A protein has these predicted regions:
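Function-determining surface determinants
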Residues: 1-499
Length: 499
């Protein structure tokens, strides 16, 4: 068994010649005596009709190289930026017919039905590519640098393979990150969060990329150290972000952008906590903030979407004013900046940010404060943070629209901290406390929608209709009353970390 740790970098197929020369130059800079091979690799990937290997996050292939055949199973692992880490097992075979019983029995999870899966294995797709391979000396080991050029084939469809992999084989992981930076800058390479197998499943129509818009509670445990809890939260945020980035790259849409925004927001919240623990995060929080500026258009888009949604509270009334409704719909489309976001995702700065987040998660720097148990620290953090939120929301009898909007970022930040540490507490008590505050946050965001409507009506003679103006005012007053009711009810809830 080997524990695979490799950095995957995607390049544009048109860069193949430049990539080949860049890899040669890198290899020569490491060693004057080149250890180089060129291999033609044919790979067939297998799963059951109901994709049970995929459900276990496993990948099974048989690879042909010259007259040699090798069967490989990759077990569940993780992706940090473009760094892939997962256990891998290999056995030689005599034919292109998979046999799971050739692997040692103790590699499988306890609930893994080896023989049932074996009976139903079928080929799903193939990959054929030329592998250019260099071995680079590094510390007490080496790094395998490979350039793969070829294609994935499934159901008559093809997709180009053009990627560079840097696999650590006992060397210094910092060398991999330094090389990754060089490749990003010279070849406009991007972090590869999807493996060849994952892309093959997509091409074969056996998998789909759907945005994850809602973040869930991070799976932290009371017995973990604070370091384990914070780095796990950061890893979860990065995974959520990168999944949605892959969705954006596959088919640019607003839901993918919203999912990215949620993941980035979570990552930044965790980085700020690490910074308070005196962990050197090397400006990562500020760099994340710069990425967030490319997502600020989502606030206006979501406000317009609230007004035009067919199942929303305002759709029926606004539909009566066809010109206004069409203008709202047009504005909703005009505010979208997906093209600019995709350009940002492909930029050097963005890719180097992902690389540095991956570097932080692999290194996991420690401080004395990070060694404490996470539960008591999380309880104190949530209590102190919430005390500030509570004081702000309880300061007067009635809050204005402007005051609610000003308090929204603080409320959202506090709810996000709850996402990081909520699993440490009783689910029913936790959800009972959070629910009215989440409703309040949604209601405050609705104020933005009504402000947009007010602005558009006010600035246009075409829609200066007295009935519409009065209707708007009624909606704003009704929303404010609902917010006041929710706020006062929420303030009476007992915090779940005190129960």
């Amino acid at each position: 068994m080997s524990q695979e740790l490799e950095l995957k970098l995607m390049i544009e197929p048109k860069q193949r010649e430049n990539a080949l020369q860049t890899c040669r130059d890198i290899a020569q800079n490491f060693s004057k005596q080149l250890d180089y091979q060129e291999l033609e690799l044919e790979n067939a990937y297998y799963d059951t009709s109901d994709l049970r290997l995929r459900q276990f996050d496993m990948g099974l292939r048989i690879r042909r190289s010259a007259d040699q055949l090798e069967q490989t199973i990759k077990l569940a692992g993780r992706v940090l930026g473009g760094m892939h880490e997962r256990p891998e097992y290999n056995v030689p075979v005599l034919e292109m017919s998979p046999d799971l019983t050739l692997f040692e029995e103790d590699i499988w999870p306890d609930d893994f039905p080896v023989y049932d899966i074996q009976r139903d294995l079928q080929q799903l797709f193939v990959t054929d590519f030329t592998r250019h391979r260099w071995i680079l000396p590094s510390a007490d080991g080496q790094i395998e640098l490979v350039l793969d050029l070829g294609q994935i084939n499934a159901n008559g469809e093809t997709q180009q393979i053009a990627e560079i992999e840097l696999e650590l084989q006992g060397g210094d992981v910092e060398d991999i990150y330094s090389l990754g930076e060089q490749i990003v800058e010279q070849l406009n390479a991007r972090m590869g969060s999807l493996s060849k197998a994952a892309r093959g499943y997509l091409l074969a129509g056996r998998s789909v990329l759907e945005p994850f818009v809602q973040t869930h509670f991070v799976a932290v445990k009371a017995e973990q150290s604070l370091a384990e809890a914070l780095y796990r939260s950061l890893e979860y945020g990065l995974r959520h972000w990168q999944h949605n980035e892959a969705c954006l790259d596959n088919h640019a849409n607003v839901r993918a952008a919203q999912g990215m925004a949620d993941g980035i927001y979570l990552c930044r919240a965790v980085l700020e906590q690490l910074q308070r623990m005196e962990v050197d995060i090397d400006g990562l929080a500020e760099r994340l903030g710069r990425v967030q500026t490319h997502l600020t258009w989502l606030k206006r888009f979501e406000g317009l979407a609230e007004l035009t949604a067919e199942d929303g509270a305002y759709h029926r009334a606004l539909k009566r004013y066809s010109g206004l409704y069409e203008l709202l719909m047009d504005n909703q489309q005009q505010v979208v900046q997906l093209h600019q976001l995709v350009e940002q995702v492909h930029s050097h700065d963005y890719q180097l940010l992902l690389l540095d987040l991956s570097r932080l998660l692999i290194a996991r720097p420690q401080t004395e404060e990070l060694q404490q148990p996470c539960e008591q620290w999380a309880t104190t953090l949530l209590r102190d943070d919430w005390r500030e939120v509570q004081q702000e929301f309880a300061e007067t009898e009635d809050l204005s629209e402007e005051r609610y909007l000003k308090l929204l970022p603080k409320l959202q930040h506090s709810l996000m901290l709850g996402t990081c540490f909520g699993m440490l507490f009783d689910p029913a008590t936790r959800d009972n406390f959070r629910s009215p505050w989440q409703d309040l946050a949604r209601g405050i965001r609705e104020i933005t929608a009504l402000h947009i409507l007010h602005e558009m009506v006010k600035n246009s003679d075409d829609f200066n209709d007295q009935k519409l103006i009065e209707w708007q005012q009624v909606q704003r007053e009704s929303l404010l009353k609902a917010l006041e009711y929710s706020r006062k009810a929420a303030l009476k809830r007992e915090p779940y970390w005190q129960v």
